[in-house]
């Protein structure tokens, strides 16, 4: 039953997106101009001719790859930063690491992600022959880690202090207590917030084209530069982003329902 419901929901979403695309296209097309291309001709010119749709396919693929691996990097680095800051707050230890972590969070959260991307590509990796996708993953991973660190830290602080005392009474070292008892509870509490961070990250990757990488937005821009038609490529890009975000949001809501029920 749930599979059938999901399939019907996906079909309704596809039809809705298609209807929006068609309605906007019809409204934006001047009917009075006899020499104006028809919708079909414009669609063919923008996406079918010279296989231009492949720019969007390649762009979507790169966008998803960057998002997934940047999120993984952000989770690992963010968890380490959150643990360092929590240990310092609770034990007063790791003062130097905590100072570095606070400086990192201040710099990353206080500067635009686009500037960070440009610095990493044109300054840090200026003399290194490296593919563009890994550069973007590093840039967005470092950016995402700063926000994920605070999310995880908030989740750790939300765990009752008695859990730390329980681990200590069992003779477990602080690190083992943190990894085996505290973090699993914290992750469960903040999982929806982490998923939402992934959605934000997906949209932030739209600036990847500034370093010459063909992401989804850049793919649409390439089509525009070849056809001199801005409407269809950019609307297609917007609808693809919208579709992906709506699907991810749907799964996040289902996840929240399951977590609240457990």
Which residues fall in each region the model found?
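Transmembrane alpha-helices and adjacent helix-loop boundaries
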Residues: 2-16, 21-262
